[in-house]
Amino acid sequence: MTDDVGDFQENWFEHNVPRWREWLGSFSGRTGLRALEIGSFEGRSTLWLCENILTADDARIDCVDFFAPDPVYGDYHARFRQNTAAHRAKIREHAGASFDMLRKLEGPYDIVYVDGWHSAFGALADGVMAWPLLKVGGVMIFDDYLWVPPKLGEPEKPSGLSRRLTKLRGGDWRREARLRQIDSVAVDTPKLGVDGLLATLRGYHEVIGSDYQLAVRKTRGFDQGQVGHDT
C-alpha cells in the first residue's frame, strides 16, 4: 500500500513509536550519531530514525538486510530505497546475511536495532556480534521479544475467574498466556536467545523497557586486560 510517507505493504512499526521516543529521544540531533539496523525490510524504522533521531547532517545509519526479492513480500528492497530516498546520504546498505555483514562493520554505534532472524539462535547470534559494536551508554533494541510463530494463533483466553485472580496479583493474563506459548516453542522464538545473551551480560547493561520489544542500555564495556587474560 502507499501511505502518506511512502510505499509500504506492512506496518509492523508505528505502534513502537511512543516507546522509541522514550528510549531514544535523548539522542535526537546529536552530531556524529551512528545507528546500526539489522533487518530493514521496507524502511519504516529506518525512515523514522532519519526523521526523528539521526537529524544532524553527519548522522549515519548502517542497514543490514538480505535486500533480495522475497516470495511473499516481493521486491521490498526497491520499496526500501523509495521510502528512504530523501535520506540517502545518511544510509549505507549492507546486503547479505547478518553473520557475514556484522563482522565487516566497525563501531562504535550509539543505537543498535536487532530485527533479523526470528529464532533463538538468530537473535542470540545477532546480539553477540553487535554488542561489542555498541558504545557504553548506547541503546540496543530487540524487536519481537514476545513474538511467536503465526501458526500458534492468539493465546487462549482463560476463564473470567482466572483473569480476575491474575489481575489481583498484578499480572497480565495476555502476557502470561503469550509467555506460555513462547515456552512451548522456545527455540523458534527470539526471546530465548535475547534472554541468554543478557544473562551473560549481567552487570554490563540495564533494561530500560520490556514489552513486545526489549531495550537495554550498555553500562560497561569489556576492558582489554579482561578480554586478553580471562582464559
PLM features: residue spans?
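S-adenosylmethionine/decaboxylated-SAM
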Residues: 2-231
